[in-house]
């Protein structure tokens, strides 16, 4: 679960380009 949540956060971060 932790890894999946991390991937989701990275994906949303890249989509919003606010890393």
UniProtKB/Swiss-Prot annotation:
GO terms for biological process: defense response to bacterium. Disulfide bonds join 13-19. Its main location: secreted. Expressed by the skin glands. It comes from the Eukaryota. Keywords: Amphibian defense peptide, Antibiotic, Antimicrobial, Disulfide bond, Secreted. The keyword Lyase does not apply. The keyword Secreted applies. It is found in: Secreted. Belongs to the frog skin active peptide (FSAP) family. Brevinin subfamily. Stimulates insulin release by BRIN-BD11 cells in vitro. Has antibacterial activity. This is Rugosin A-like peptide. It comes from Pelophylax saharicus. The lineage of its organism: Eukaryota, Metazoa, Chordata, Craniata, Vertebrata.
């Amino acid at each position: 679960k932790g890894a999946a949540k991390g991937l989701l956060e990275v994906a949303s971060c890249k989509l919003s380009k606010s890393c």
